[in-house]
Structure formats: C-alpha cells, structure tokens
Curated annotation (Swiss-Prot):
This is 2-C-methyl-D-erythritol 2,4-cyclodiphosphate synthase. Disulfide bonds: none annotated. Gene3D superfamilies: 2-C-methyl-D-erythritol 2,4-cyclodiphosphate synthase. InterPro entries: MECDP_synthase, MECDP_synthase_CS, MECDP_synthase_sf. Its cofactor is a divalent metal cation. PANTHER family: 2-C-METHYL-D-ERYTHRITOL 2,4-CYCLODIPHOSPHATE SYNTHASE, CHLOROPLASTIC. One of its GO terms (molecular function) is metal ion binding. It catalyses: 4-CDP-2-C-methyl-D-erythritol 2-phosphate = 2-C-methyl-D-erythritol 2,4-cyclic diphosphate + CMP. GO terms for biological process: isopentenyl diphosphate biosynthetic process, methylerythritol 4-phosphate pathway; terpenoid biosynthetic process. Homotrimer. Pfam families: YgbB. Binds 1 divalent metal cation per subunit. Pathway: Isoprenoid biosynthesis; isopentenyl diphosphate biosynthesis via DXP pathway; isopentenyl diphosphate from 1-deoxy-D-xylulose 5-phosphate: step 4/6.
C-alpha cells in the first residue's frame, strides 16, 4: 500500500464584507476575509495539503489569483477539483486533521457542520475528518483578530 502525507497552510486577513465562509459553511461574524476567491481559508489549506501529498504544487498554481475566472470562486468547487486530481492518480483520503487558529469567531459551534461538509466533498466518512480550533492567547495577528490561519494534514492512500 502506498501512502502519502500532505500539509497545507493558509492565512487570510479580516476586512472583507460578510459572509465569513469557513469549511464550506457561513459562520456569523461582522466581517469576512479578504481574498480573490470566497476566502475559505479552511478549504484552501486542505486543498494545498491534498495537492502537496500528490506532488502537484499548490492552489496558487492551479487557481491563480491573477485569473479573473477564479474571482469570488466557491472554494468547495476548488477543493473537489483538487480531490479529483488525487483520485485520478488512484488515491483516496485516509484521514484529515485541520487546525483553525483564530481568536474570533468561536469555532466550537460550527465544527460538526464543517466536518459534515468535508466528509461530503471528500467522499469520506465523518470519522476520518477532524477539525479543531485554537487561539494564540491574544498573541500575533490572529490574537489581535486581524485574520485567521489554518493548518491541514492529509493522509492519502493508494486505492
């Protein structure tokens, strides 16, 4: 059995108009994230992790922010595209672990809904998807509520 690990990281700055979209769901918050696409920092980190595991570069290579076709793009569509590339190479998701780093908004009320979206988009069981959140104890840009950072790790197995 061939196994591949991918790590993804993404950051977006607060300041855009609502909605705030995280993990494919709308999270109530007074501002959105500034981005070329819909700004879903969670799905961007996961997409990067999948592309990394497959040695296919990153989301900037596949969906450049200089391309007007991706202006306001739905990050769920981008994630499904990245996962299809992996499936076309004969791989499927074994498990996913995501860490959302944000002082605000509070993520706990939204984690199960995000897990359900991810399980659907990645054709996986919800028990193979973990999403957790942490703060930086008011330190750094996330602690000052200037933005959100996300790390994602995927384990992909050859089908």
């Amino acid at each position: 059995m061939k196994i591949r690990i991918g790590h993804g990281f993404d950051v977006h700055k607060f300041g855009g108009e609502p909605p705030l979209i995280l993990g494919g769901i709308t999270v109530p918050y007074e501002v959105g994230l500034i981005a070329h696409s819909d700004g879903d920092v969670v799905l961007h980190a996961i997409s990067d992790a999948i592309l990394g595991a497959m040695a296919l570069g990153d989301i900037g290579k596949h969906f450049p922010d200089t391309d007007p076709d991706f202006k306001g793009a739905d990050s769920r569509v981008l994630l499904r595209h990245c996962y299809k590339l992996a499936m076309d190479m004969g791989y499927s998701l074994s498990n996913l672990d995501v860490t959302v780093i944000a002082q605000a908004p509070k993520m706990a009320p939204h984690i199960e809904a995000i897990r359900a979206v991810l399980a659907e988009d990645l054709a996986s069981e919800i028990c193979d998807i973990n999403v957790k959140a942490t703060t930086t104890e008011k330190l750094g840009f996330t602690g000052r509520k200037e933005g959100i950072a996300v790390e994602a790790v995927v384990l992909m197995i050859k089908s």
